[in-house]
Amino acid sequence: MINRRDFLQTSALGAGAMALFGTSAYAAELQEADELPSEILSLRSRVEEAPPPISESERDERRERAQSLMDEHGIDALFIEPGASLTYFAGLRWGRSERTFGLLLPRRGDAVVVCPAFERERAAKQVDGRFEIRTWEEDESPFALIGDLMRSWGTGSGRLAFDEATRHFIVHGVSRDAPSLELVSGDPVTHGCRGRRTA
């Protein structure tokens, strides 16, 4: 029996194939009819000129740069929710929901992914062994988990920064469940990294 996800994927692929086939057939008809200007007909594909994908070593350098900026600004850790910054620093693409998911990057050491327990397997496929994954159950607080991780790094009363795209309920939850932390803006770190080109 086909499940909903497989059905949607198959439908999307079929629709995409039909759209491509229809477009290709239409373009061929126009080309045969000499209705396209010569400038259009002379265009060539530039796929081979596309820049290479971001390597993991480059992402390592980005995280190291972030840690250097954290040191400079007295920030002990940076929490990054799903979005452009999570992709930039970790190569992770994750949809947002009401359940907290993100990357906790300490000033020194390796980043940790904070993830709902039921999503662990899916997260592990993307993480691919690059980061430790720490999970929280439905009856537990992800914000307390963030505080616990900070304590395990010896920064239980340190400064925790948030990426500018972090939603209010997460910042509020951490302030409630890990009150010993000082919560600050992560802009000096994220802007300091993302505001400069590395390639």
Model features per residue range: what roles?
Residues A12-G16, F21, E29-R46, E58, ...:
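Flexible, acidic/His-enriched mid-domain "rim/lid" segments that flank
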Residues V47-I54, F131-E132:
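Short, basic, glycine/proline-bearing loop/turn elements
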